[in-house]
């Protein structure tokens, strides 16, 4: 099951990782993240295609899936576990458990954010957003998408 999760996410990762690199606009947004959590969206600085919180969820999922895959090999019976001492397997189990908790928490945050921010479900399921939504939620990305050649 874990290998299938990684394979399923790999295509998404390869497609989206460049858009999820943290930049200066994200660092500025991060400074005001508390305002967003309080519901004071109007005071948030403009962001690109993804905001810092979205990028944080992306990287939490990517890293935790990678750690789950690698740590899983350490105790995958009967194929790989015989090659590793029990101490290494125990460390692998601990890393595996921590990574699973991180992945589950990131998934819960992701689902919550989809419900919390109106218009996000449409963006995820259809791949499109309205012009007003883009302007209000991702002003820098909107500007990049609407500027002429």
Label the model's feature ranges.
Residues 1-149:
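Membrane-embedded alpha-helical bundles that constitute the cytochrome b-like, heme-associated redox core
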């Amino acid at each position: 099951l874990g290998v299938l999760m990684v394979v399923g996410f790999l295509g998404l990762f390869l497609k989206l990782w460049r858009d999820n690199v943290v930049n200066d606009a994200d660092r500025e947004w991060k400074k005001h993240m508390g305002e967003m959590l309080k519901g004071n969206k109007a005071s948030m600085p403009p962001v690109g295609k993804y905001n810092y919180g979205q990028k944080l969820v992306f990287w939490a999922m990517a890293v935790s899936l990678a750690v789950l895959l690698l740590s899983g090999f350490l105790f995958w019976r009967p194929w790989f576990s015989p090659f590793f001492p029990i101490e290494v397997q125990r460390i692998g189990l601990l890393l595996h458990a921590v990574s699973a908790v991180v992945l589950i928490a990131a998934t819960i945050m992701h689902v919550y954010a989809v419900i919390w921010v109106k218009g996000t479900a449409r963006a995820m399921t259809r791949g499109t957003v309205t012009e007003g939504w883009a302007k209000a939620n991702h002003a820098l990305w909107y500007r990049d998408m609407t500027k002429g050649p």
